[in-house]
Each structure stands twice: as structure tokens, then as C-alpha cells.
Amino acid sequence: MKNLLIYINPLKNFDSETAVLVKVQIDNLLSLGWKPKDIMIVTNFDYTYQDIKTLVLGDENYCQHHPTVSKIYTIITLLKKGLIKSEIYWLHDFDGYQLHPVTKKSFKLGNADFALTDYGRMPNWSTGSIFFKKSSKDIMEWIKQTTDKYHTDEETALSMLTRQNFQEINSRIKKLNISYNFQRFNLVSNYFAATKPIKNVHFHPSPDKVDFFMYGKNKLNKILLPKRLIRIFNKHGIK
């Protein structure tokens, strides 16, 4: 399995938040046992941290109408260049943090080419955490075509495709348990629905969200991050 992070910016640099989160991500993934060769960070500029270097692609992978769609553009480019191999890739946002190990032995895509969660009680797809294989190339292209046609984001585009079961796309997509992209929406119902231990949480490190996840200031009065990850956040000034 490969862990994939994508950041394309016309300014050819990380914004202030992501400049911190890229270090959090790398330290976190290494502490979870990921090998450096299995951590793939794709940008349109050079960057190195902990001896992990970014794979640099062109600015054409930036999506003007919805910047989050840049990850779909970039995956298509990686596929066309033969840089996606015959294994599972876990794409997640920089503000999505793995909490516990996920291995190819414990995680199965089955016959699916593409897997992700929804928002729990909200049925819309959540593309902040996606598992995919190279056989999903046409799905990625359908998403891109739909976003470009309607100038919409990738989550809306995917929902449009699955609602009409375009080209029988639904048979190739696996809906994952909310544990793989746990957010603070609908906390109580989603927490009890989540397979434990929760594998991945998703939040921007603003003070209110740090309080929510790191200090347990939520309806469950529960700290939702392991001490290991809290130490990494603290190391990089997120407290």
C-alpha cells in the first residue's frame, strides 16, 4: 500500500497551514511504521523533510474552478505517466490524520476499484480519504469531466455519477466505514457507528477543532487523538 498526499499551488509553495501539516503528516506516518518509499507526496515544487522528497509535476494539474479537484487532475497525470503501480493507494488530505495502522492485510478493497466514506448521517461522498487502484483511471476521468463540465467540486461530481449509476460505476465503488475519515459532524451517531479503533480523523488545526479532538471538548467529553499524535502536533506548535 502507498500513502498519497497531493498539493498543487500556483504560488509553488505550501500555504502557512499546510507548511506545518506536511511535517505533521510525515512524522505521523513514519511513527506508524510507513516506510519512506511508500510515502508519496506530489507537489508542483521541490520540498524535502525527513529525507522524503516530493514528486514534482507541472502546474497544469491545478484546477482553477475548484482547487480541491487538483487531486483528481494529479492522479490522472500519475496514471498516464505510469506512476501508479499495481497496489492500493491511500489518498488523503493534509488535514486528515491516520491514528492507527492500516495494512493491506487488514484493509480489503475486494472487487472495488475505488473506496471512500460518506459523512455519516449525511449521505454525500467525502473525498478527503480515498483508497484506489490503477484500474480506477476511468472513474477519475469521469469525475474530472463532470467537474469541468459543471464547474463543481469532486464530491458533487462523484455524487452525480453514482446517483445515475453512470456506466455501472456503483458496482466498482466501496463505501467505507466512517472510521476511515472521521469528522466532527454528527459526532455521537458517527462515533458509535465507527469501527474502533478509529483509523483516520479529519480536521483543520484551528483552536476550536484542536479543543474538540485533542482536549475532548465535545459532546462525548472524549479525547479523540492518541498521545503519540498529540506529541507530534505539539512538536510542530499545535497545542
Language-model segments: residues:
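Catalytic core and acceptor-binding pocket of nucleotide-sugar-dependent glycosyltransferases
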Residues: 137-238
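Short, polar loop motifs at secondary-structure junctions
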Residues: 41-48, 98-103, 206
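Conserved hydrophobic/aromatic beta-strand scaffold that supports enzyme active sites
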Residues: 74, 114, 129-131, 175, ...
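GT-A fold catalytic core of metal-dependent nucleotide-sugar glycosyltransferases
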Residues: 54, 67-124
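N-terminal anchoring/stem segment of glycosyltransferases
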Residues: 1-67, 77-85, 134, 219-239
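Conserved catalytic core of nucleotide-sugar-dependent glycosyltransferases
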Residues: 98-163
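Short, charged, surface-exposed secondary-structure boundary motifs
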Residues: 63-69, 122-129, 210-213
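A structural signal for well-ordered alpha-helical segments within the folded catalytic domains
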Residues: 20-23, 69-73, 152-160
